[in-house]
Amino acid sequence: MRLTDRRRPATDYRCRVPETSASDLVRSLLLTVPDFPQPGILFRDLTPVLADGAGLRAVVDNLVAAGGPVDAVAGVEARGFLLAAAAAYASGVGTLAVRKAGKLPGEVLRETYALEYGEAAIELHPGQLAPGSRVLLLDDVLATGGTLEAAARLLERAGYEVAGIGVVLELADLGGRARLAGHDVHAILSL
């Protein structure tokens, strides 16, 4: 018998997404950590969602479906990178990295945004796509909306159309959605 005759049937390693909504799956996997990173803060940890094959697939499928046809997917550093890469792969398009200031070499576009005590900046390489390209912007959490607002402005300054903004979790009481008025915002789960 030749070696090729003894092949085992291929194993299907694809995740089996349960017949449940993406929001129910995220809710079931989400960890709530009290007093992190400081006393009085209730931290919502999405890492168990991303670590679970069915959870990750449900999140990516949901965000891709909500985004419609796009030319690329942009992710905000850091967990937005994970979502954007997976969504871009699932959509058959490329991905753009919206980085913290000082992390990209060469020419960059920069947007600053206010923090509670100071300001921060994010950057993007210009000219990665044709002008007018439709880009889906993803991040893990929508809180105050400052980072996503700056990221959307950055993409628009680069000459791209923000086709939509998608997040896994929206912390609705922090009012971030209002800062993103004029954009189609999709949250899988809103608390």
UniProtKB/Swiss-Prot annotation:
Q: Where in the cell is it found?
A: Cytoplasm
The UniProt catalytic activity note for this protein reads: AMP + diphosphate = 5-phospho-alpha-D-ribose 1-diphosphate + adenine
Provide any one GO MF term from the record. Answer: adenine phosphoribosyltransferase activity
Q: Which GO terms describe its biological process?
A: adenine salvage; AMP salvage; purine ribonucleoside salvage
Family affiliation: Belongs to the purine/pyrimidine phosphoribosyltransferase family.
Matching NCBIfam families: PRK02304.1-3, PRK02304.1-5
Role this protein plays: Catalyzes a salvage reaction resulting in the formation of AMP, that is energically less costly than de novo synthesis.
Protein name per UniProt: Adenine phosphoribosyltransferase
Write down the species. Clavibacter sepedonicus
What gene makes this protein? apt
